[in-house]
Design a protein with these regions (language model features):
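Helix-to-loop junction immediately C-terminal to a conserved catalytic motif
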Residues: 20
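Short coil-to-helix segment of the ABC ATPase nucleotide-binding domain corresponding to the Q-loop/switch region
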Residues: 69-77
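Conserved ABC ATPase signature
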Residues: 110-114, 118
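A short, proline-enriched helix->beta-strand linker immediately N-terminal to the Walker B motif
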Residues: 129-133
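Catalytic Walker B motif of ABC-type/P-loop ATPase nucleotide-binding domains
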Residues: 135-138
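ABC ATPase "signature
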Residues: 194-195
Length: 217
């Protein structure tokens, strides 16, 4: 688990979006689970790109659920399009995946009936449906009321315990210190520190990071 920290506008979300082709890069190389997305600033073919992107799941800040579909259909939509199995198999997968985030009783509900925390847990389940090698989280709790944040962080903590690889952009410093194996700190578009939570945020040596942590306490 890698947590990406930094002030607003430091490039965290842009970096994350670049990894799944939602932003275009003009230099460098990106590979997901050994599959190239771009090399030396040149993107691979459409087919190779699809193969690389199939290795990653994404959880956005604002849930992005289809409002006119039930939770079951929201989870089944992409797997059906990608022919991951029969309709019955994918429906059962939706049930087991939703149970993992504690929302099996909401499987036939509509998104409008769910709280923000529940919607984000559904979004996490949707990302898990693809059985990805890595899940990217773009500030998954920033759109939630403080009292709803805990339920989402709890699900993410459980995923970390299962050994699921995650790259998390977050402002939840305490959560990052507890769950992350590594912390990446960004400032003005650059990575200015990378290491264990102990080295980067518990006993920081970088003055910029010290200033940041003092302001968010």
């Amino acid at each position: 688990v890698v947590a990406i920290l930094g002030s607003s506008g430091s490039g965290k979300s842009t970096f994350l979006r670049s990894l799944i082709d939602l932003e275009t890069v003009d230099g460098g190389s990106i590979a997901i689970a050994g599959e190239n997305l771009c090399k030396d600033g040149v993107y691979v073919s459409k087919k190779e790109k699809a193969k690389a992107l199939s290795k990653a799941g994404m959880v956005f800040q604002h849930f992005n659920l289809f409002p006119h579909m039930s939770i079951r259909k929201n989870l089944m939509c992409a797997p059906l399009l990608n022919k991951q199995g029969t309709k019955e198999e994918i429906s059962k997968l939706a049930e087991s995946t939703l149970a993992k985030v504690g929302l099996l009783d909401k499987i036939d509900a509509m998104p409008s009936t769910l709280s923000g925390g529940q919607k984000q847990r559904v979004a996490i389940a949707r990302a898990l449906m693809r059985n990805p090698e890595i899940i990217l989280f773009d500030e998954p709790t920033s759109a939630l009321d403080p009292e709803l944040t805990g339920e989402v962080l709890s699900v993410m903590s459980d995923l970390a315990k299962e050994g699921i690889t995650m790259l998390i952009v977050t402002h939840e410093i305490g959560f990052a210190a507890q769950v992350a194996d590594k912390i990446m700190f960004m400032d003005k578009g650059y990575v200015i520190d990378y290491g264990t939570p102990e080295d980067v945020i518990i006993n920081p040596k970088n003055e910029r990071i010290k200033t940041f942590l003092e302001k968010v306490k």
